Amino acid sequence: MLSVYEKVNALDKRAIEELFLSEDILMENAAMALERAVLQNASLGAKVIILCGSGDNGGDGYALARRLVGRFKTLVFEMKLAKSPMCQLQQERAKKAGVVIKAYEENALNQNLECDVLIDCVIGSHFKGKLEPFLNFESLSQKARFKIACDIPSGIDSKGRVDKGAFKADLTISMGAIKSCLLSDRAKDYVGELKVGHLGVFNQIYEIPTDTFLLEKSDLKLPLRDRKNAHKGDYGHAHVLLGKHSGAGLLSALSALSFGSGVVSVQALECEITSNNKPLELVFCENFPNLLSAFALGMGLENIPKDFNKWLELAPCVLDAGVFYHKEVLQALEKEVILTPHPKEFLSLLKLVGINISMLELLDNKLEIARDFSQKYPKVVLLLKGANTLIAHQGQVFINILGSVALAKAGSGDVLAGLILSLLSQNYTPLDAAINASSAHALASLEFKNNYALTPLDLIEKIKQL
């Protein structure tokens, strides 16, 4: 997994003061990272246009232009007059190297931005408020085949809020380390592929300790059956309580069985199970089992059962969906449980604990709110769903950006609850269960050719093939 930071000012300051890497060295390495991206995505001789701003982000662009000129048809548009000392220095160096630099004329109709690669080096991490009208990157980038953002696409602020005219990159090179603003739900459509641009020193030397991490494909640890002398009891008993909409719980149960649980049982609370809708591989119980490894409640549920508090004492659990609308869920916040709400459900839970905020406030501050909640309830693991999933525990937050839009379909969350339950029943810690189930869920969604057609049962089949 990769370290994530809200800002990297402290990292740059340390690199300069402790590692004796000057601003010039850092900027040259940033330009080299951008240069590698151009070389990987365009042939020699291709037309490359670089949009440069007035600060150090613009300086990166001018340094890049100097490195490309002679091998590519390189053109720089000066979107704003160079102001920072490093930007001015890099602009002069670019001019001396023969780079063509044109002033961008806001009202000029004949400026041709058709190119093979368009690179945004305009604002970077200093964006606040709204973009100036002439910086409408949606129209500026229409004729570019491939678009690269330097550090942060212009129009995304430090909280991950996005201006409607923001630069929509195919690739973002985050300089030095990953910034948290690039991982917001709203930024997902603007960042494209995300890579780190190393600034002249190995990233683990450049970085400082952090409480925020980005999950990678390599972090997934699938269930392992490495013993030959074993039986079903060695792999846990997972129990799913079915609500009024029984299909949701049945999906969770099938998902848990497919992810390694030795036994999966179900119990109807608000529904009636007939012989026509009984999956043969599940064990159907009339009562809550005395011996079990973990249970899940909430999928398709309308009311909290009266024995809920007693069940919390018997085994670890996954709580989802319907439970977050009932005050009885508060009993679980002092137990080792995994909560898996989507934003609307999380708002309801926050209201129950006395935090009244709007959906807009939640989406604008999702990372901070999830972290604060996990610190207030240290026994709980919170998995907050969204375009990017947040997993928070005791102040640490793990961000999963691996999933696809294919998961935006009823039943996907029920499958996820089942995956978490399965790992919990197999003696994974609650945090490891949430992280690995979320990763498997996301990666399986990428295996489907047509993202509009994925069904929950298809998803379970793909999970079996990981």
Curated annotation (Swiss-Prot):
Domain (YjeF N-terminal): residue spans on this chain: 8-207
Region listing for ADP-dependent (S)-NAD(P)H-hydrate dehydratase, in residue ranges: 215-466
Domain of life: Bacteria
Record has NAD as a keyword: yes
Positions bound to K(+): N57, D120, S154
Cofactor or coenzyme needed: K(+)
YjeF C-terminal domain mapped to chain residues: 215-466
InterPro entries with a match to the protein in the record: Carbohydrate_kinase_pred_CS, CARKD, Nnr, Ribokinase-like, YjeF_N_dom, YjeF_N_dom_sf
A GO term for molecular function: ATP binding
Coiled coil segments of this chain: none
UniProt protein name: Bifunctional NAD(P)H-hydrate repair enzyme Nnr
Annotated organism of origin: Helicobacter pylori (strain ATCC 700392 / 26695) (Campylobacter pylori)
Lineage: Bacteria, Pseudomonadati, Campylobacterota, Epsilonproteobacteria, Campylobacterales
